[in-house]
Amino acid sequence: MKNTLYLFMCLITTLCLAQSKEYNSAVVKINKYVEGTLVTPYSDDSVPLIIFIMDAGAINRDGNDRMSKNDTFKHLAYELAKSGIATYRYDKRLFKMDGLGIREHEISLDHFIEDAISVIEFFKKNKKYKKISIAGHGQGSLIGMIAAKGRANSFISIAGNAMPLDQVIIEQIAKQAPGLDKSAAVAFEQLKKSGRATEYDPALESIFRYDLQPFMRSWLQYNPSEEIVELEIPILIMYGDKDLQVETAQAEKLKEVVPQADFLFVQNMNHILKEIKGGRLDNHKSYNEPFRKIMPEIISGITNFVKQ
């Protein structure tokens, strides 16, 4: 009886271990600027790979900044692995700039594009994956569009803007602080023409901070609606109606310029792909609640798109 019980317990333990090992996770360093985590499902066959590019700011590979912890892309990577999809997610260069001795005024959006391209080229040389898809979140959507051109097999825009940065910010200011939008418009024109904005309301200092202006100017060179139409690969556009950072109008505008793209609009989903049943307070709280699950529509939507 004891032997039978022992064998039974061994079998249960083996099954549990097998279930927990649905994927392998490893740190992969591309170069001194780019380091991330590769999550690969256990499979005898070649699997597709998704490269995630994070949103604006000092965001790490899991989707967190220094003020919040939601682990969105960590959870998403594990869920996609269960569906037979490998993922690579990496820290934004801003997240590790102090350790690299990089100053804020030295950072350009082009650096982020270079980082994304270096990741794509690294995995293309590997020749291990069935196909490579790029998925950009927020600002990462624009970066991904540019990097994917001529390099990736498909592109996924997650809560990305359709309009150039200055238009997005001016519209937001007009709604939140009417009157200041005119000052912002003048400052953006100065920044684009002369490289420096000097005439703006002091209330806009956080936007037009001196050391931030070179980065802003580099970002202003790109228009998402112009970049995405140059892609000759399958496109998936994803948004949620509880997004406090990117308005639903951006989704419609992006859809207009690439009508052939697949489009997924998720009810009650916020910017970090979590379900929000309450109001703004519940939405803000979710940014520090890593236990919240990713919306299932996102997992199935990405899986179906990548595997088609």
Region spans (language model):
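Short alpha-helix in the alpha/beta-hydrolase fold that links the catalytic acid
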Residues: 233, 246-257
